[in-house]
């Protein structure tokens, strides 16, 4: 068995004296592991750092085997990311989110979204809002996507302001007002223009509301059912990314 693909390095763990088991999020083959002979060498260690984009050839006798990777660098982002605490926490959290996916299950749209996220992780004006959208995308690919297109009560797409914690569907400002204390806030940057969104740059408060929204559904549908706690990296990333939210 053999295939070639590009991938984002999620991590690597030591295997023996000279090798590593490399974990990639690939464009066409999903999250995939493989052995890299000589992965601990001086030449290969910089290539296999989390956040880097690589070209990988995977070979194995049987499709279900661990197999071996031959890896070449495409883009080295690790050096840039290491200089930013926000980026390091964001990268760790993004990797934890991708590990929620079944191994070897292709998710090409999430791979593309992860590349965009990694490219902007060092920018505090962009990265937090991108992470909220990335969490929404992970929820959708796990089968728990939110419907933010129209009001669950009226069917209208005008002035959407809330999300029902039960259905995961948007609710308009007027329809939700009597029950606002029971609903989750829908920040403006997640509302389409045709549904009343302004298109304005999200404020730290908007982003915090976004993380509250995604965090609720991740906990309800993913973390709690699997018996795992939210990643500490998420908490640290949210704290840094919304520091001015008050």
Swiss-Prot record:
- Please give the superkingdom of this protein's source: Bacteria
Q: InterPro entries per the record?
A: ARFGAP/RecO, DNA_rep/recomb_RecO_N, NA-bd_OB-fold, RecO, RecO_C
UniProtKB keywords: DNA damage, DNA recombination, DNA repair
The UniProt entry, under Gene3D superfamilies, shows: Nucleic acid-binding proteins (2.40.50.140), Recombination protein O, C-terminal domain (1.20.1440.120)
Q: Name one GO cellular component term.
A: bacterial nucleoid
Q: Which Pfam families match?
A: RecO_C, RecO_N
Q: Which GO terms describe its biological process?
A: DNA recombination; double-strand break repair
Give the signal peptide, or none.
none
Family per record: Belongs to the RecO family.
Function, please?
A: Involved in DNA repair and RecF pathway recombination.
Put simply, this protein is called: DNA repair protein RecO
Q: Which organism is it from?
A: Methylobacterium nodulans (strain LMG 21967 / CNCM I-2342 / ORS 2060)
């Amino acid at each position: 068995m053999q295939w070639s693909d590009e991938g984002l390095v999620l991590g690597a763990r030591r295997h023996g004296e000279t090798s590593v088991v490399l974990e990639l999020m690939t464009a066409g083959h999903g999250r995939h592991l493989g052995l890299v002979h000589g992965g601990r060498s001086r030449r290969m260690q910089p290539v296999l750092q989390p956040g880097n984009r690589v070209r990988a050839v995977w070979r194995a006798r049987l499709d279900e085997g661990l197999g071996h990777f031959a890896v070449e660098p495409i883009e080295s982002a690790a050096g840039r990311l290491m200089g930013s605490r926000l980026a390091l926490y964001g990268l760790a959290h993004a990797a934890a989110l991708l590990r929620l996916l079944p191994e070897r299950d292709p998710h090409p749209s999430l791979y593309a979204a992860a590349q965009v996220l990694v490219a902007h992780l060092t920018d505090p004006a962009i990265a937090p809002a991108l992470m909220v959208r990335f969490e929404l995308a992970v929820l959708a690919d796990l089968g728990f996507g939110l419907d933010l297109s129209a009001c669950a009560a009226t069917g209208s797409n005008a002035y959407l302001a809330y999300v029902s914690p039960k259905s995961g569907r948007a609710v308009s400002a007027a329809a939700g007002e009597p029950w606002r204390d029971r609903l989750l806030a829908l920040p403006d940057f997640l509302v389409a223009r045709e549904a009343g969104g302004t298109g304005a740059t999200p404020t730290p408060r908007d982003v915090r509301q976004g993380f509250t929204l995604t965090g609720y559904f991740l906990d309800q549908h993913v973390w709690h059912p699997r018996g795992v706690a939210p990643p500490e990296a998420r908490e640290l990333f949210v704290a840094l990314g919304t520091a001015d939210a008050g």
